[in-house]
């Protein structure tokens, strides 16, 4: 018997500007191969300003940013002020350990939208400008490989549609062998 992984869309966020945090919204239109309609990070090629300077033609593997509400709760307990949307995430989830999912996992958001996970968010220096010590608080070093961060995972939109706060998230794992997430 296969255990079904199910979570919930706790909050949604979008901003047309390249700001660190994003304001809350009640629903969002996801566009296949693009991201969230009206969000500064949506587009078929990289939209993050630091990455555009290096190579603006690269595919955008960071169309939609997800953070678990459980991380927000943990950081608040440690004294950080991190409301939903504070990390610049588009989607705050509950009930899923996003960092444990392999690359290529697909998440069905509500009835229509499907996104595919591409990797961990690699935070820029703005995270410590937002709150001192936050970068260290979300860092971890696996037994092998580079230092990683648990301040969210990135994804691309496979199938578009509208997502609303409270929608169910259903996870489908890719075929084995599973590839662990790396930073993108």
Question: What kind of region is each of these model predictions?
Answer:
Residues 1-184:
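Metal-cofactor-dependent catalytic cores
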């Amino acid at each position: 018997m296969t255990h079904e992984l199910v979570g919930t869309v706790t909050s949604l966020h979008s901003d047309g500007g390249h700001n660190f945090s994003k304001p809350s919204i009640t629903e969002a239109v996801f566009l296949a191969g693009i991201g969230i309609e009206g969000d500064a990070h949506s587009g078929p090629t990289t939209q993050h300003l630091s990455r555009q300077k290096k190579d603006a033609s690269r595919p955008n593997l960071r169309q939609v940013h997800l953070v678990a509400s459980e991380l927000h709760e943990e950081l608040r307990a440690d004294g950080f002020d991190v409301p939903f949307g504070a990390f610049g995430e588009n989607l705050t989830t509950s009930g899923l350990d996003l960092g444990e999912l392999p690359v290529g996992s697909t998440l069905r958001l509500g009835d229509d939208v499907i996104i595919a996970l591409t990797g961990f968010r690699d935070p820029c220096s703005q995270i410590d400008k937002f709150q001192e010590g936050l970068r260290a608080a979300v860092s971890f070093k696996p037994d092998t490989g580079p230092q990683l961060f648990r301040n969210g995972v990135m994804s691309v939109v496979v199938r578009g549609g509208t997502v609303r706060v409270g929608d169910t998230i259903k996870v489908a794992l890719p075929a084995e062998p599973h590839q662990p997430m790396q930073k993108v």
